[in-house]
């Protein structure tokens, strides 16, 4: 990537999903090519500040408002640009600020840099060349969602599903692999919706698998109803796809899944798990769960706990239900008291932790390839193909973004501990 002389300074703030992370990296690369220099010290003001926000929950909105205020305070003369879902969901907040911010809609995210500069020039393409501070590269393949789950505000903020051209995606992945990235994560708001003409997500993965130099392919997250026969075959048969999936659950109760407007049942979810494990009995899963959805009974909650144990997730991301205006669930009866949600979430976290550690115990004595993501002092940390977090003492020199063979010796609070072999 060609860099011009320094014309000014910029700061980037990213909140939320992996798609947002991809977009912020694209802004970083565009600005660098244009000759702007990134400021990483929060105490040093910049000329331009861009914040990519999230509004998936009320808590995410609150974090976004705080981050915007902080940017305004720390960068008193900067041009503040806000994009992402908070800009779509809470325009009143920005109208109430003493400081004027430029709002760029989600639909115009890819043209953000063009919109904020008035001078006439050829702007760099909205794509990534690397992924700052990451050992894996997130590649956005799709945006928007057509599912309209009853709790989710995202379709109203990001719009309908739109897929990127496969050729652009493949070229972008080849570029980051050439830069030395071993692992790419196929990311989107609803990745299972991906479709470029006759090219499905399955065919895209098969083509990514053929890119010279790629070592690992993951899908950021996917719903069980999107796992078609073709996609299952692509994931389990491709040479570089990892034997793990973030398979979204949300609830283990059929009645709650129906009220959520999810497109699968408890049985469908378990069938999907078993199908993957037929190809690899050790196939690993992580998931998301919403705790305290309106009407969630004690039995519904027990159903969720039981499926966590039955599947043996290595990690569960749990979220308290957050009532979002414009969604169907916002008006549902039988809202669960906050204290009950808090207690259930705490208990679910304890169960999930125990289950995850039990699953990792099964790996002890094995040797696995770890992609190094961080080296702190004499300890390196990364993930196995099964997405288990692995730490090990450094022997000699171990570089970030390299694959290292590690024998797994024990399980501790944060994951597996091993030794280089």
Curated annotation (Swiss-Prot):
Q: Does the keyword Transferase apply?
A: yes
One GO cellular component term of this record is: cytosol
Residue numbers binding [4Fe-4S] cluster 1: 17, 54, 85
Highest taxon of the lineage: Bacteria
Which keywords has UniProt assigned to this entry? 4Fe-4S, Cytoplasm, Iron, Iron-sulfur, Metal-binding, S-adenosyl-L-methionine, Transferase, tRNA processing
What reaction(s) does this enzyme catalyze? Answer: N(6)-L-threonylcarbamoyladenosine(37) in tRNA + (sulfur carrier)-SH + AH2 + 2 S-adenosyl-L-methionine = 2-methylsulfanyl-N(6)-L-threonylcarbamoyladenosine(37) in tRNA + (sulfur carrier)-H + 5'-deoxyadenosine + L-methionine + A + S-adenosyl-L-homocysteine + 2 H(+)
Segments forming domain Radical SAM core: 131-358
Q: Name one GO molecular function term.
A: 4 iron, 4 sulfur cluster binding
Its localization reads: Cytoplasm
Please tell me where [4Fe-4S] cluster 2 binds in this chain: 145, 149, 152
Spell out the PROSITE patterns in the cross-references.
MTTASE_N (PS51449), MTTASE_RADICAL (PS01278), RADICAL_SAM (PS51918)
Family, per entry? Belongs to the methylthiotransferase family. MtaB subfamily.
Give the protein's function. Catalyzes the methylthiolation of N6-threonylcarbamoyladenosine (t(6)A), leading to the formation of 2-methylthio-N6-threonylcarbamoyladenosine (ms(2)t(6)A) at position 37 in tRNAs that read codons beginning with adenine.
What's the protein called, per UniProt? Answer: Threonylcarbamoyladenosine tRNA methylthiotransferase MtaB
């Amino acid at each position: 990537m060609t860099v011009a002389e320094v014309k000014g300074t910029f700061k980037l703030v990213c909140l939320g999903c992996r798609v947002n992370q991809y977009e912020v990296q694209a802004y970083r690369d565009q600005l660098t090519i244009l000759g702007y220099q990134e400021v990483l010290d929060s105490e040093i003001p910049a000329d331009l500040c861009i914040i990519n926000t999230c509004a998936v929950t009320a808590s995410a909105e609150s974090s976004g408002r705080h981050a915007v205020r902080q940017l305004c305070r720390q960068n008193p003369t900067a041009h503040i640009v806000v994009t992402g879902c908070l800009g779509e969901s809470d325009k009143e907040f920005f109208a109430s600020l003493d400081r004027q911010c430029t709002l760029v809609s989600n639909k115009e995210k890819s043209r953000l840099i063009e919109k904020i500069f008035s001078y006439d020039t050829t702007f760099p393409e909205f794509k990534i060349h690397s992924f700052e501070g990451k050992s894996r590269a997130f590649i956005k393949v799709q945006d928007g969602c057509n599912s309209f789950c009853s709790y989710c505000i995202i379709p109203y903020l990001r719009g309908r599903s739109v897929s990127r051209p496969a050729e652009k995606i493949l070229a972008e992945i080849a570029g980051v692999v050439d830069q030395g990235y071993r692992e790419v994560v196929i990311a989107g708001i609803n990745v299972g919706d991906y479709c470029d003409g006759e090219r499905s997500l399955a065919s895209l993965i098969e083509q990514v698998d053929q890119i010279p130099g790629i070592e690992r392919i993951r899908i950021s997250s996917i719903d069980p109803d999107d796992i078609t026969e073709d996609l299952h075959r692509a994931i389990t048969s491709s040479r570089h796809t990892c034997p793990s999936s973030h398979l979204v659950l949300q609830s283990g109760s059929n009645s709650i899944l129906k009220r959520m407007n999810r497109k699968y049942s408890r049985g469908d979810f378990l069938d999907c798990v078993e199908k993957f494990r037929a190809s690899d009995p050790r196939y690993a899963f992580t998931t998301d769960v919403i705790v305290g959805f309106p009407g969630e009974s004690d039995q519904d909650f027990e159903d969720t706990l039981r499926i966590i144990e039955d599947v043996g997730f290595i990690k569960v991301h749990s979220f308290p239900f957050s009532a979002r205006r414009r969604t169907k669930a916002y008006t549902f009866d039988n809202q669960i008291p906050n204290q009950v949600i808090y207690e259930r979430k705490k208990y679910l976290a304890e169960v999930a932790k125990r289950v995850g550690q039990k699953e990792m115990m099964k790996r002890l004595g094995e040797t696995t390839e770890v992609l190094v993501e961080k080296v702190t002092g004499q300890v390196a940390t990364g993930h196995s193909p099964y997405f288990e977090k692995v730490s090990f003492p450094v022997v000699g020199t171990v570089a970030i973004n390299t694959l290292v063979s590690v024998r797994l010796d024990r399980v501790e609070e944060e994951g597996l501990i091993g030794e280089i072999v």
